């Protein structure tokens, strides 16, 4: 075996020292991210400037009017409403089965609200990823309308220790408190539907769909046994919740499916964004030690990190690990589906990535519409170009790689054609 050059040993030792933070230290607080020390450049920061003169007036509005204002301003549809009755939130003391927390979402923002409490907002920053804010009616000038919240990070940094979204399924008791010692789990793409939505209200779901939603109990068997799962159907939330306090009286199952999908993809995008920025930040020092020219393309561990994140992005975008739908499919009340389709981008054949299937899977063409999102567009150019080039290669390959094997040839062809026509700024490596 040939000897290892001294410069590689020195470089490895240097990087090891740089990457050895204290056990409770978050890497995203260091350059180039510097999460807490950096002022976000997101939509909420700009809205604070616009609403500065109205902040006190808006705080005095009735709660539902404030919620409507936030939703309309952030272009988040009220029809996306979900209701969570478990006390797993910053405002846990206000939440109960009779007073659930409402969640709303779009491709670019997430909004949470509990009657009697503040409005929680998550949006995305080009460098920081997920950023968290609170609109509190009790605040007074000179506080801005939207206040950045560091408390959210106590729970919202669980996805590879980056600021992220979180969707949990737990075993709630009659008061919405998670049962002691019962555990719970994050909802991932592969999570079976029988294990999802513990602590959530689920409306519009077919009787064939077994899940943990709508159920309160005293032991795990109350949720997972046939009796518990079969009692999960709720014909009308008005029997439990004073629904007139909320924009809608539903927590639609299709909106839940979409929320699960988007939370996962947004988390993968945010992690890829931060990890690749860190790798690219370290690349000049590595390049200098290796004696490479300034225009040298990323190599070594930097390239390995970019390759790894590109693979994860492709897996998430193509719904590689999607749990199988129950026989007969999943149908909701149709309200969310109609609103979701309004922003579809169609190709010349009328096909769109926002077309839903709901028979055997979520999307008719299994490539996430979040590929059009600002978050994906904000990825470092090196990573975005690499991801899209790999995506086009896999979609066009006669013998597709493993990440594409779940997609039939006709579906791969359709996805490629849709993206070629509808996705802006395709890289030179995109195969046409």
Where are the language model's segments positioned?
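Sequence context surrounding c-type heme c attachment/ligation sites in exported
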Residues: 111-297, 301-304, 310-318, 360-432
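N-terminal secretory signal peptides that target proteins for export/translocation
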Residues: 1-4
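Boundary at the C-terminal end of the N-terminal hydrophobic targeting segment
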Residues: 20-22
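Surface-exposed patches in mature extracellular/periplasmic domains of secreted proteins
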Residues: 78-86, 323-331, 399-410, 427-431
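N-terminal alpha-helical interaction blocks
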Residues: 24-116
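Acidic, glycine-enriched catalytic cores built around paired aspartates
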Residues: 316, 329-359, 375-376
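Bacterial N-terminal signal peptides
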Residues: 7-17
């Amino acid at each position: 075996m040939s000897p290892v050059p001294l410069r590689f040993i020195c470089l490895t030792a240097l990087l090891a020292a740089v990457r050895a933070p204290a056990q409770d230290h978050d890497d995203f607080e260091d350059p180039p991210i510097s999460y807490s020390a950096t002022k976000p450049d997101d939509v909420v920061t700009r809205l604070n400037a616009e609403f500065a003169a109205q902040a006190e007036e808006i705080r005095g509005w009735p709660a539902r009017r404030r919620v409507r204002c936030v939703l309309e301003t952030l272009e988040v549809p009220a029809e996306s409403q979900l209701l969570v009755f478990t006390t797993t939130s910053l405002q846990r003391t206000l939440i109960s089965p009779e007073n659930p927390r409402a969640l709303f979402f779009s491709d670019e923002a997430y909004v949470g609200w509990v009657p009697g409490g503040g409005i929680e907002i998550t949006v995305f920053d080009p460098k920081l990823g997920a950023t968290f804010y609170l609109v509190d009616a009790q605040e007074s000038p000179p506080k801005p309308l939207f206040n950045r919240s560091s408390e959210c990070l106590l729970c919202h940094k669980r996805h590879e220790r980056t600021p992220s979204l979180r969707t949990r399924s737990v075993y709630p008791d009659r008061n919405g408190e998670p049962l002691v010692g019962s555990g719970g789990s994050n909802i991932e793409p592969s999570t079976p539907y029988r294990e999802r939505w513990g602590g959530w209200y689920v409306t519009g779901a077919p009787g064939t769909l077994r899940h943990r939603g709508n159920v309160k109990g005293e032991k795990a068997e109350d949720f997972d046994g046939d009796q518990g799962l079969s009692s999960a159907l709720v014909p009308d939330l008005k029997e439990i919740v004073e629904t007139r306090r909320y924009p809608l009286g539903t927590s639609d199952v299709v909106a839940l499916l979409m929320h699960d999908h988007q939370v996962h993809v947004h988390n993968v995008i945010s992690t890829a964004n931060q990890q690749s920025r860190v790798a690219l930040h370290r690349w000049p020092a590595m390049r200098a030690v290796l004696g490479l020219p300034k225009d040298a393309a990323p190599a070594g561990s930097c390239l390995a990190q970019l390759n790894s994140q590109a693979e994860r992005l492709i897996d998430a975008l193509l719904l590689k690990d999607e749990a199988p739908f129950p026989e007969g499919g999943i149908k909701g009340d149709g309200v969310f589906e109609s609103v979701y389709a309004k922003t579809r981008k169609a190709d010349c054949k009328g096909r769109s990535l926002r077309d839903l299937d709901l028979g055997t899977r979520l999307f008719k063409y299994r490539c996430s519409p979040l590929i059009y999102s600002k978050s994906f567009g904000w990825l470092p150019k090196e990573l975005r170009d690499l991801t899209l080039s790999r995506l086009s290669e896999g979609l066009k390959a006669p013998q597709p790689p493993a990440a594409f094997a779940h997609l039939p040839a006709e579906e791969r062809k359709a996805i490629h054609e849709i993206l070629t026509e509808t996705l802006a700024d395709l890289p030179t490596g995109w195969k046409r």
